[in-house]
Amino acid sequence: MAHRESQTAAERNEYTYRQTVTLDELDNRGAARGRYHEVRDIIFSPEHERTEQVVGHTENALKYLRLTDEDFRDIRDIQPLVLTEDTLWNYETRFRGDETIDGIDCWVLLVRPRQILGGQRFFDGMIWAEKKDYNIVRLEGRAVPEIRSMSSENLFPRFTTIRKPVDGKFWFPVYTLGDDTLDFRTGPQRERLRIEYSDYKRFGAESTFTPH
């Protein structure tokens, strides 16, 4: 599986795509009372270097939550996690059985970080990998660690990331969903997260998959 993930990571690095992040603060009735919305294109520069470009105006009308550097690192690295041969050694994995997801026969694995040092971010949760080609098709868990100090708290929601095949070969993230209540000292705060990864195009080619 890690070998397949390394192939997936290398292939995804050859694609441009659009990343749309929406985070809603919800009141105790489930109504939105604050929102963060941002669209980024992950593209190549004229020098063929990978870069990001914000599209349009970023809306930040959050009232109680504040997005931190760790949140943006998680959006970039944890929610669309790829468990390559270079990163898998950071994790303990345990077999949890098998399950059919959307008609796909999968192995189910528990994945937890072996050790967390200062400043590191990891995934803690479950993954579903198809039995046929070992592609990861689903992740459920959260980014860790939570960060608590006397003066501040930085808590992170549970999420589910779904992958779909792009160009009929490798499975790339297409959306991340999270709906969780974070237990701050000042009181619980429910939030709803949605990240869409769309318009995948191989550099110099046309896209064959655009999620809706």
Predicted regions and their residues:
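Structured extracytoplasmic
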Residues: M1-F123, K131-V137, R142-P157, P165-Y175, ...
